[in-house]
């Protein structure tokens, strides 16, 4: 990918949610909501603080994260739909 986010921004690929409920009910495409889980495919160098120093991000490429449903800006790169958002919009890192 030829996309490098600046400062405290990250590029995220949405991860598909489960197609079935725990009870075995298949969820149709029309009833699905946008996934709020994704994998970081690129990350900026860090947040620039008021004193000019750079604070490294807490997330890195390859991390799986949770974010708000309407967070970020949707973009399309080489036919792939991605999200660009600030690190502050990420709610949690999913530990493996």
UniProtKB/Swiss-Prot annotation:
Entry's localization field: Cytoplasm
SUPFAM superfamilies registered for this protein in UniProt: GroES-like
Chief subcellular location: cytoplasm
Keyword flag Chaperone: yes
Family assignment from sequence similarity: Belongs to the GroES chaperonin family.
Quaternary structure and partners: Heptamer of 7 subunits arranged in a ring. Interacts with the chaperonin GroEL.
Function recorded in the entry: Together with the chaperonin GroEL, plays an essential role in assisting protein folding. The GroEL-GroES system forms a nano-cage that allows encapsulation of the non-native substrate proteins and provides a physical environment optimized to promote and accelerate protein folding. GroES binds to the apical surface of the GroEL ring, thereby capping the opening of the GroEL channel.
The name this protein goes by in its record: Co-chaperonin GroES
Naturally occurring in which organism (per UniProt): Acidithiobacillus ferrooxidans (strain ATCC 23270 / DSM 14882 / CIP 104768 / NCIMB 8455)
Classification lineage: Bacteria, Pseudomonadati, Pseudomonadota, Acidithiobacillia, Acidithiobacillales
């Amino acid at each position: 990918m030829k996309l490098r986010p600046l400062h405290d921004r990250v590029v995220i690929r949405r991860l598909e949610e489960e197609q079935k409920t725990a009870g075995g009910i298949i969820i149709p495409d029309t009833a699905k909501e946008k996934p709020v889980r994704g994998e970081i495919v690129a990350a900026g160098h860090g947040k620039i603080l008021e004193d000019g120093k750079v604070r490294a991000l807490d997330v890195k490429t390859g991390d799986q994260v949770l974010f708000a449903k309407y967070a970020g800006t949707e973009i399309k790169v080489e036919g792939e739909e991605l999200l660009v958002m600030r690190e502050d919009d990420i709610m949690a890192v999913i530990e493996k």
